[in-house]
């Protein structure tokens, strides 16, 4: 009986913890989606941001798929994988019913244990943008820019 009471109390505590907003848990808040490129880390100048916005707008006009870029200083204490899922849940990228949105996430000051780069792809593009392709894009295209 004591074990059952303990498990019930633990389950209740976990349920209440997950119901708390991210800010109450000490997690980084998800910024509002205001543009295709959200640079909260100050990594891009205005010209770079405008150029990237243009490329993403053209891609969306041609394919219908929506790509957003989020640049933040850090996702600590949360790993980039969990943070990017919270972002895609909040932003609802892609077309409704198609789920073809993609998030490119960069957390420039994350420690290597939390990773700094992530591509989060909706189910509607996972056949075209596989995990292996995402990894290759991050390693071969995006990561080299951090070494410059």
Where are these regions (language model features)?
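Bacterial N-terminal signal peptides
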Residues: 8-21
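Folded, non-transmembrane soluble domains that reside on the lumenal/extracytoplasmic side of membranes
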Residues: 23-148
